[in-house]
């Protein structure tokens, strides 16, 4: 999905705020995904799935760190996430349908914590960005 200059501006404006507390926001998004879509827990057999668990927060930070890395390479998301794509496709074999579920919960979390910044333009840009990241992460499945 092609990101416009305006999309990139909005992504770069909000991602540092999210990345500053990646464990909190990433953990919240994961917790919501696990709660709403229990089948996504399959890949985390030893996790404590309670709200604010250290395991969910730590993995949430990894998710947000990866998104921040992708945001630093908006003109080459595929290149910046190639190793992560390989990991999810070949080693972890994550169901590709899980990425849009997590993307949705990231949007919900950002909207909750950043209502002033999450205007329609930022919503559109972040949605396109997360769709692009999801596409890259599932590209090796084909």
UniProtKB/Swiss-Prot annotation:
O2 binds at residue 59. One of its GO terms (molecular function) is oxygen carrier activity. PROSITE patterns: GLOBIN (PS01033). Involved in oxygen transport from the lung to the various peripheral tissues. Belongs to the globin family. Heterotetramer of two alpha chains and two beta chains. Heme b binds at residue 88. It comes from the Eukaryota. Residues 2-142 form the Globin domain. PANTHER family: HEMOGLOBIN FAMILY MEMBER, HEMOGLOBIN SUBUNIT ALPHA. The gene is hba2. The keyword Iron applies. This is Hemoglobin subunit alpha-2. InterPro entries: Globin, Globin-like_sf, Globin/Proto, Hemoglobin_a-typ, Hemoglobin_oxygen_transport. Keywords: Heme, Iron, Metal-binding, Oxygen transport, Transport. GO terms for biological process: hydrogen peroxide catabolic process. Red blood cells. It comes from Xenopus borealis (Kenyan clawed frog). GO terms for cellular component: blood microparticle; haptoglobin-hemoglobin complex; hemoglobin complex.
